[in-house]
Amino acid sequence: MTKKKIGLLVMAYGTPRTKEEIEPYYTHIRHGRKPSQELLDDLTERYEAIGGVSPLAKITDDQAIALEQKLNELYDDIEFKSYLGLKHIDPFIEDAVEQMKEDGVQEAVSIVLAPHFSTFSVKSYNGRAHEESKKIGGPRIQSVESWYDEPLFIQYWVDQVNDTMAKIEDKDKACVIFSAHSLPEKIVDYGDPYPQQLKETADLIAKGAGITNYAVGWQSEGNTPEPWLGPDVQDLTRDLYETHGYTSMIYCPVGFVADHLEVLYDNDYECKVVTDELGIDYYRPEMPNAKPEFIDCLATVIQKKLAEKE
């Protein structure tokens, strides 16, 4: 039996793989404007603080390969081939779509490695993929828009919260902070579902883990003058401590799916500076990365998308 071929377009933000790639990467994020030496030095220092470069590039590769393998195990009649498309560094999203076309792929399914939909992220990734496909005449792409409430995703974080709580003696004095990457506040005016989806994710995990001490915050906001979604996780940490006297903070950056700069620096360094200053305990559960239970989650999301009537 001839297997049907489907392209698996896995999209993500991207990260520099070497120190030399930091400047072009940052320039692309800034829409072609080169960063000042001061900004470049600041970003480079952050990377150096987590070991030189982010482990994200390898993790994203591992996630795409593992997802391809899992889907090929699940389907007897379909052969999946994964293509990585990145937002700010090669291989760009457009490169991946072109490669699928070159490989003779006529049908594809796409997923962004970010659970919550926003006009800034998922809509823009999917838009770029569809635009390129239209421009070059294929392949036809079915796109996943969000998976923030996928039961296997929620269960991953429920297990992480439970495992972390098991290490804490005074559980009544522990608080979980659920967070995602902040975006400009103006998205709320456009009716963007991003903030509400993060809240729903937090509520579902809290319910599953049976916790009532939790809050939602935002992190890693951009370096621009416009207002960004808040409260920032560092400010939130101080407020929660002052209001409730918590002695343990558990940071769950559920808007992210891997160890990278925003987690390894913004959480593990910047938030820990705050908890150390307050004299309280810092906990940050393991990120999904390419763990089998997370790959199962992504595969389930893809299965559901393919089962939809077009």
From Swiss-Prot:
Main subcellular location of this protein, as a coarse class: cytoplasm
Gene: cpfC
Keyword Lyase included in the entry's annotation: yes
Residues noted as binding Fe(2+) in the record, renumbered to the chain: 181, 262
Lineage: Bacteria, Bacillati, Bacillota, Bacilli, Bacillales
One GO term describing the cellular component: cytoplasm
Signal peptide: none
EC class (word): lyase
The name this protein goes by in its record: Coproporphyrin III ferrochelatase
The entry's keywords: Cytoplasm, Heme biosynthesis, Iron, Lyase, Metal-binding, Porphyrin biosynthesis
